[in-house]
């Protein structure tokens, strides 16, 4: 019988156990598969569990270990992947009901890279339809129903990587892959009390994955610690001829590769907490800022550039999604989506003109210039992920989260990396989170700063008690 703490253990904790032979990947994988059978439906975590594949991969890496072939820290570690990454001979439905018979012939690049690193795929996690690129108003905009938060199943996981958040927070996988166009990694990380990184645009290949907004979409992990995020990111990052958007130069992600934290200058975004924020979230966020300050980070209140990032990101994402999903509009299948906002968005997109898009692209370039200048004065931005905890699953998200992520639109427009860090508990005992955001390809600074914070706090070790 495996100890209960393995379900919420980090890669750093599990890896030595597997390498030493004290724990086999098959044993660990069987345990996670049992938990998926027991808990997945409660949280709408998995769309397609892959028990046969998982046990085959686990047996293979155990055999490798007996032959003294150690693949690295992910050797034998069970994980889950958002159901928009192609997986050979496994259905990949992009969060929809009408694509459930779609079975790819090959793997996405990130799936191949994780397999090469020795990780074991437990299955494909549920997600918001088309990753939310067409917009959605309700948490149930998914083939599996709303993502239910393991901390309280009456509340949302966040999206669009809803199942990835539920799987890791519920102890159904050690880590999970998510994607983000605008908030889809950091949101479920925040609401589920996880550590998650949205890498710089172009750092990780999207080849073999659903790409709804080509110049916005990123791939990254949700995990139990910054160190785990670093390990996974190092395994999946890098140039890929299958994805022309990938950076060709290698980005250093090793510990200490970022800017020295003692010299970091952080911009603290002023927010109107009296208007929209929850006091418990503010208290937890203030304590996190104080912790960073005590560690030596210089923090100054500074507003973000006053630019129309929300409007520009919204228009361009909509147009790119229209191009990506046009076949489903043409054949009428878009009307089968659960949330009625998506087909209306596609129809509205058809009235946007070429000059509208050209203007938006020019404004986006200006926004990116503004942010390059901003990061000449500051190394990172510090802000809450949200000013409230996870909302009830039945609420209209436009009403329960009217202000969203304070820096989400800017980060989307500029391809900025961001790191979500657990910061305690708020209303109804739900997780509170904050984020640090850096300039493009300064992901290592975020990881180093996150390591510093998690060395001084234990919020990332908290997990829900499941029975």
Task: Tell where the protein language model's regions lie, with residue ranges.
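Acidic/His- and Gly-rich active-site-bordering loop/insert found
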Residues: 64, 68-140
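Short glycine/serine-rich loop segments
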Residues: 106-236, 412-435
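Glycine-rich, small-residue loops and helix-cap segments
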Residues: 21, 76, 116, 120, ...
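A short helix-breaking turn/cap at a secondary-structure junction
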Residues: 198-283, 456-467
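Acyltransferase
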Residues: 22-33, 59-62, 279-303, 325-335, ...
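An N-terminal boundary/leader segment
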Residues: 1-57, 294-296, 351, 462-467
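Short helix-loop capping/hinge segments that flank enzyme active sites or metal/cofactor-binding pockets
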Residues: 75-94, 260-270, 318-372, 420-431
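Glycine/threonine-rich flexible loop motifs
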Residues: 92-101, 278-279, 391-400
């Amino acid at each position: 019988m495996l100890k209960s703490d393995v379900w919420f253990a980090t890669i750093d904790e599990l890896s030595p156990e597997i390498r030493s032979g004290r724990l086999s990947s098959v044993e660990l994988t069987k345990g996670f598969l049992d938990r998926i059978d027991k808990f997945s439906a409660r949280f709408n975590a998995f769309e397609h569990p892959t028990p046969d594949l998982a046990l085959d991969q686990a047996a293979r890496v155990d055999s490798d270990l007996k032959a003294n072939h150690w693949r690295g820290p992910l050797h034998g570690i069970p994980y889950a992947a958002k159901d928009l990454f192609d997986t050979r001979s496994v259905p990949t439905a992009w969060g929809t009901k009408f694509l459930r018979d779609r079975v790819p012939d090959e793997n996405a690049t990130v799936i191949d890279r994780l397999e090469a690193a020795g990780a074991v795929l437990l299955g494909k996690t549920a997600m918001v339809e088309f990753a939310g690129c067409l917009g959605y108003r309700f948490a149930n905009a998914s083939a599996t129903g709303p993502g239910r938060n393991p901390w309280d199943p009456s509340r949302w996981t966040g999206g669009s990587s809803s199942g990835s958040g539920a799987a890791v927070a519920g102890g159904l996988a050690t880590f999970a892959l998510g994607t983000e166009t605008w908030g889809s990694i950091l949101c479920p990380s925040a609401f589920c009390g996880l550590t998650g990184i949205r890498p710089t645009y172009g750092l990780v290949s999207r080849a073999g994955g659903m790409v709804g907004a080509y110049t916005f979409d990123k791939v990254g992990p949700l995990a139990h610690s910054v160190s785990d995020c670093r390990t996974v990111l190092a395994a999946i990052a890098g140039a890929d001829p299958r994805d022309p958007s990938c950076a060709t130069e290698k980005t250093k992600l090793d510990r200490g590769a970022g800017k020295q934290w003692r010299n970091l200058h952080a911009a603290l975004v002023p927010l109107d907490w009296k208007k929209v924020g929850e006091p418990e979230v503010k208290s937890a966020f203030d304590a996190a800022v104080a912790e960073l300050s005590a560690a030596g980070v210089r923090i100054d209140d500074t507003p973000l550039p006053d630019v129309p990032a929300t409007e520009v990101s919204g228009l361009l994402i909509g147009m790119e999604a229209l191009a990506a999903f046009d076949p489903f509009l043409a054949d009428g299948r878009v009307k089968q989506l659960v949330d009625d906002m998506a087909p209306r968005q596609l129809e509205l997109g058809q009235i946007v003109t070429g000059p509208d898009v050209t203007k938006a692209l020019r404004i986006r370039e200006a926004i990116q210039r503004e942010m390059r200048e901003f990061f000449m004065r500051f190394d990172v931005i510090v802000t809450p992920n949200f000013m409230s905890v996870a909302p009830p699953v039945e609420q209209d998200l436009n009403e329960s989260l009217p202000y969203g992520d304070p820096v989400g639109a800017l980060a989307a427009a500029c391809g900025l990396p961001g790191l979500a860090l657990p910061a305690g508990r708020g209303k109804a005992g739900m997780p509170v989170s904050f984020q640090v955001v850096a300039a493009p390809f300064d992901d290592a600074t975020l990881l180093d700063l996150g390591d510093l914070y998690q060395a001084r706090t234990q919020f990332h070790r908290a997990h829900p008690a499941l029975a």
